Structures are given as structure tokens and as C-alpha cells.
Amino acid sequence: MKYFTIFVFVFSLCMLGHVSGAGIRIVNELKNKKTLWMRCYSKNDVLGPTVIPNGGQFTDYFFHNLFGTTRFMCTLKQGPGFSHSQSFRAFKNSGLWDWRAREDGIYLRRIYKAKFDDGADNLHKEQSWI
């Protein structure tokens, strides 16, 4: 019975992380049909590199680890010459991290739902281009 209780406890923690959702979305909202180069990585995974067309997006859902220490770092570069760039922590702990690349910077909206939506509420500038 003791092992069953431990199993149920660990299983519940895993399911809680799954239900709450974890993910990154990067949306290209740059002007003048500019493309957006992106590459993200964690301790265990690499996303990209890929080029996101103007108006396009890159979305990745994943499981964060049991201890809540999952981190993703991302680098974004504005096309066509990719001379403006920024590297930043794109995910920490939990939730859905919705990033929007715009001419004046990179904006973030954190969502605590199961999936991304098209809303723009609570969007704030988090990074400036270098």
C-alpha cells in the first residue's frame, strides 16, 4: 500500500504539470515582410534553427520536469540581413510563454491555460533589439 500511495502521488504531480501546460510560441509581427530567425535550447532539447515568415509563428508544447527547473533560452534575429538580434530566457518553470517579435522589441504574454490563443491582453515589452 505504501508503494501505491507513492505512485499515486508522483503520478498526480506529473499529471498536474501536463494539465497546466508548458510551451513557447514565437510570433513574427515585424513590418515590411521581414523574416525572423529563431533558435531555442534547453538542457535536453534544441528547437530550430528555423526562419519564421512574416505573420507566421513557431509553437512548441512540452513537459516541464518534476522539479520545475525547465528553462529555455532563445535567440531571435530580424531579417533580411539578421543584423538586429536578442538572446533571452524564453521559458522558466511553467505556463505558456507567448513571445511577439515587433519592430521596437520583443513582447511577452504569459498564459495559464491548456493552449495558446490569439489574444493580446497582458502583452508587455520584455526585450529590445540589439
Curated annotation (Swiss-Prot):
Pfam families hit by this protein: Self-incomp_S1
One cellular component term from this protein's GO annotations in UniProt: extracellular region
One GO term (biological process): rejection of self pollen
UniProt keywords, alphabetically: Secreted, Self-incompatibility, Signal
Name recorded for this polypeptide: S-protein homolog 32
Family: Belongs to the plant self-incompatibility (S1) protein family.
Signal peptide from the UniProt entry: 1-21
Subcellular location: Secreted
Species name: Arabidopsis thaliana (Mouse-ear cress)
Keyword Electron transport: no
